[in-house]
Amino acid sequence: MMQFSRPGNFKSSAYICATLALASFAGTVAAQNTTSKMEGMQLSNDQPIAIESDQLEIRDQERKAYFTGNVKVVQGTTTLQAGKMTVLYKGEGSSLTSGDANIDKIFVDNQVFLNSGTQKATADHGEFDMAAQTFILSGKQVVLSQEKNVFTGCKLTVLMNTGEAKLESCGGPVRIMLDPKSQKKQ
């Protein structure tokens, strides 16, 4: 078991961050559909990625890494914040610290916040499944916003390979607040 404490800027975790940033928030749901295409987020592979947390614990034998306390992932204008992030990876002899880990799933919990320019998302939980190419934001209330346009539900599922997205309700309707002035800016 390996433990690291703040500050943490781990270049070997670049794949984790790129996947998190790309999958986590690709845009906002269009019009009044609960199923829609999401605009792809533009990330540069040549931009540095920084991860910091109060503590990092790597358990290579279990193929798990735990980032806990004030987790912050930044690449360019995209920022992910959460109370904790758990990374599951696979591959015999692979190691997160050497950069050869094959990421299987990533879980983020405790006040998940994503911000990319004018686009923002908040949730209680997030899950990335690399094999299924899906990302799910869930919780008591998932809020997506772009400028004054706001979409609220309890579960957002994004198919990373197609950009398809579905926002599900909390037992009642999915709520959408659209600002007609935002259409004129685009």
Regions found by a protein language model. Name each.
Residues 1-186:
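Mature-chain termini and adjacent capping regions
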